[in-house]
Amino acid sequence: MPNPKNTIRLVVVTTADDVDEEFNVNQPLQVLFNRALHEVGGEGNQDQFALEYNDVELSDLSRKIGDVAEELGWVDGTQLDLVPKPVVV
Amino acid sequence: MAWREDARTEIDGLKPHFVSKHGWSPRIVEHEGTDVLDLIVTLHSKRLGGRVLALRLRYQPDWQIAGRREAFVDPDDRSREGLEHWPPARDPNVRGVNPEHNPPCICLRGVWGYHSVLHADRPMGDTTLLGFLLELQKVLDE
């Protein structure tokens, strides 16, 4: 059944403050990623962080939030993680 | 002592979401009469077939510059340390964990091995305990 709303409330747990907001389902995941990055001050180091759901990285950030939500069964309040990627040099 | 309070503050500040998700069970061990505070963290490694590891991060007065001193210890008797408690060096190894290095160390930001041994030119800066543990958990699972 199609979601009559055009927003979904998502929570992103980060290493700083968490994000808990409504997002337009027509926006790309990049918007959610950027919002979470802002909380950790990582805007300039996108490649050092990953947006994850159930421990799986959401790597295609161009996909619409609504499409991913439908595919993965997200509902209002679904929780994701923003985690740092290991930097081994 | 400020260094000890700072250590306790960052340990107490670990986010319950991540602690619970990964089963870290952080535990502080203090040694009377010494400038040492140990944090013991339980780690479960998918990469190593579910092996349980116990990481000891030793805080000393210089930890904010030198890094948190890392060692893996016996999960059943955390007073015992030794290479046998580290992830293996190969087949499968764990990226960034170097048990064969002298001294054994971890090449991830936030610990002594990174900031004082392998990359002494790279300061601790704003590295955090939580960030380090998440990075270590990631390499233990990948």
PLM features per residue range, with description:
Chain A
Residues 1-89:
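Ubiquitin system architectures
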